[in-house]
């Protein structure tokens, strides 16, 4: 069973995403702060996917993802935001280029449960493919 770490400071969003993923038989680890996500990433065994809100109170989803990927280079990341991806890439392009293109995706709020599940499945499947290039590629 794939294990998914979710980071969102909004309790309703965190619970909603967790419930949907659990209904699809994923093992879910929840975190409401960046430090909690990093600790869970270290202590909860192998993580198949990291799902994170981009805009967090004391850090960014990008910063937390980079810390997790530093210790697990094959970890795929799904970024979630109500702000368009173009804004984030213009603001933080150098950091996005540090993620392998085939192991990162972005979904903009509001999104459907189907959209979320398709992106989760695709990212987990991509981890089985060999690493080919670096850089951010929006799907």
Q: Language model features by range: what are they?
A:
Residues 15-23:
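Charged docking surfaces used in two-component/phosphorelay signaling
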Residues 63, 67, 83-108, 114, ...:
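Alpha4 helix (beta4-alpha4-beta5 surface) of REC/receiver domains from two-component response regulators
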Residues 10-14, 113:
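Short acidic/polar segment at the start of the alpha1 helix of CheY-like receiver
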Residues 14, 57, 85:
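The feature encodes the CheY-like receiver
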Residues 30, 56-59:
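Residue-level signal for the "D+5" position in two-component response regulator receiver
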Residues 30-49:
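Acidic, metal-coordinating helix/loop segments flanking the phosphotransfer/catalytic sites
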Residues 10, 54-55:
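The short loop immediately C-terminal to the conserved phospho-acceptor aspartate in CheY-like receiver
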Residues 53, 81:
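Active-site residues of response regulator receiver
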């Amino acid at each position: 069973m794939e294990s998914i770490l979710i980071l969102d400071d909004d309790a309703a969003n965190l619970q909603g995403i967790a419930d949907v993923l659990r209904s699809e038989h994923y093992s879910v680890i929840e975190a409401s702060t960046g430090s909690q996500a990093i600790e869970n990433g270290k202590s909860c065994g192998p993580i198949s996917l990291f799902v994170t809100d981009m805009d967090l109170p004391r850090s960014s989803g990008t910063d937390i993802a980079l810390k997790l990927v530093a210790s697990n280079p094959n970890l795929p990341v799904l970024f979630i935001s109500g702000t368009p991806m173009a804004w984030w890439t213009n603001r933080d392009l150098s950091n996005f280029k540090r993620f392998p293109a085939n192991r990162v995706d972005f979904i903009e709020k509001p999104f459907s449960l189907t959209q979320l599940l398709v992106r989760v499945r695709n990212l987990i499947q991509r981890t089985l493919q060999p690493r080919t290039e670096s850089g951010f590629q929006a799907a």
